[in-house]
Every structure is written in C-alpha cells, then in structure tokens.
Amino acid sequence: MRLEKRRVILFVAITFLLSWGLAAYPWFGGMTQDSLNQPAALLLGGYMWMPALASLLTRLLTCQGFSGLGLRPHIRGKGKYYWWGWSLPVGFSLAGVAVYFALFPGRFALNLQFPQLEGSTLLAMLLAGGMVLVVPVNVFTGVIGEELGWRGYLFPQLCKLTTPGWAAVISGIIWGVWHTPLICMGWDYGLDYPGYPWAGVAVLTLCCVAMSAWTGWLTCRAGCIWPATLFHSGINVLYSIFLLEGNFCGQAYCPLLGAHPLTLIGGWLLLVSGGWILLKSAHLFAGR
C-alpha cells in the first residue's frame, strides 16, 4: 500500500513538473492562446504527452515494469464500449445545444455561410463530420498521451488504494487542475469572464471529474484505454468545433455558460450522467 501511494505521488509530481515546466515560458511570459510565438507553440505541443512520459518514468523509477499499459485492444465481446466511447460525446453535445438554445433562442447564429443548408442541418453535419473525420486523427495528436497517463496509469493505481468511484473523482480533480496554465492562457474559455482564471479552472475541473467517471468506467469495462481515448478525443473535437463557430452564438455570452460540452449549460448531460455513474459506481464498475 505504501509503495502504491508513492507511485501515485511520484506520477503526479512528475506530470506537473514536466507539463507546467513546458508551459512556464509562455505562461509567465504573458502570452495567450492567440499570441503564442513559435517556440512557445512547440513547447505546448508536448504538453499533452507529459502524462504518458510521467507514467513511463514512474514505472521505471519504481521498478514496476511496463505491463498493463492498457494499449492492447480487446474487441471481442467489448465492441459496445468502443461504440459508446465514440457516440456519447455527440449525444452530450446535442443535448447541450438543445437546452442552451431552448433557454436562449435569440442567440443562435452560424458564421459560416451555406445558403443551400439550414443552420440546424449544418450544425448536425459539423458535429457528425467532426466525429467521423477528425476523431481518429485527434486520438494520436495528444489525447493518447493524456490517456496513457490518466486512465492507463493514475486511475488503476488509485483503484488499488480506494474504490473506482473515488479513483475517478480524485483523478478527475488532478486532471482538471493540470490544465491550469492553459486556462490562464485562454484555452477553453478565453480571458474575459467573471472570476478569470480560477472560475475557468473550477468549471473545467468539474467537467473533468464527470469525464473521468465515464472514461474510468469505459476503461474498466473494456480492459484497455481505447474507448476512453475515443470519448476524450470526441469531446475535444466537438468543443473545438463550437469554439470555431463562437459557440454558435450571435450575441455576447458567458464562456462558462456556453453551448459546448465543457460548460455548465452545454455540458449539463455530461455532468448529470457523470454524477450518476459516481453514485452508482459500486455496481457499474463491477458490471452489475
């Protein structure tokens, strides 16, 4: 038990040291997401890979070995978890869009102009096309680096120390706080919102806990990290589509209360369902 705790602490320390070390130059240099120079952009390009590197270094330094990385896919009898990992982000996003624009119908606007398509049709095409075309690419451009660390190492290590539900909560909090330098530089929510940047860190951390519930469950049930990687990648891709289109809003809005799935309104179904998984974790993670 003592060794397992040391491994968790060492992994978290290495992850934050490496990641925040890469972010230090642009972060303390006063740069933002929109004003990065080339060296800063190159440094931040490695940020998402640091959890994977930390997991490998922790295994090496504690003589843990490299089995159980979670990379071997298990398809037979587990295919539904891959489908869930792929499709759930779309469901969460559509539910968020529906509720957000039901609450604020006057805000809906599309900046892209396709006269032959209605706005709702174009939105559906953007969401579906992003999932089909971009998710497979996004998996290998940073998401796999995160998942090798968070679900491939931290989550199963925490499961040795506590229940899967609490492991999901703890790893989700760590995952959310890990994004702090990026949030301070304007990722996800920009720079102009009440409580910047700590309100942004808090909202993203809450969303990360909900995502951690889903990705932890997918990892437990599938026996590998790939369904969780698809889920994580899907959320990233859909969030990016929303930011490119200004949350599909033609009026000013609070970024923490936007339409994309990493906000308090757009992410309502992610948050509610993630909370439900945590409440039922004793049964769900065991497959009952």
At which residue positions do the language-model features occur?
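N-terminal membrane topogenic signal
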Residues: M1-A13
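Residue-level signature of the transmembrane alpha-helical core
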Residues: A13-F16, W49, W86, V90, ...
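Aromatic-anchored segments of alpha-helical transmembrane domains
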Residues: F16-A24, V90-A98, I173-L182, S233-E245
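Alpha-helical transmembrane segments in multi-pass membrane proteins
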Residues: G21-F66, G79-V90, R107, N111-V134, ...
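Juxtamembrane "helix-exit" motif on the non-cytosolic side of transmembrane helices
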Residues: A24-Q33, G186-Y189, E245-G250
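C-terminal membrane module of polytopic membrane proteins
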Residues: L60, P194-G200, F231-R288
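Membrane-interface helix/loop boundary segments of multi-pass membrane proteins
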Residues: I144-V177, G216, C220-C224
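Membrane-interface interhelical connector segments
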Residues: I183-Y196
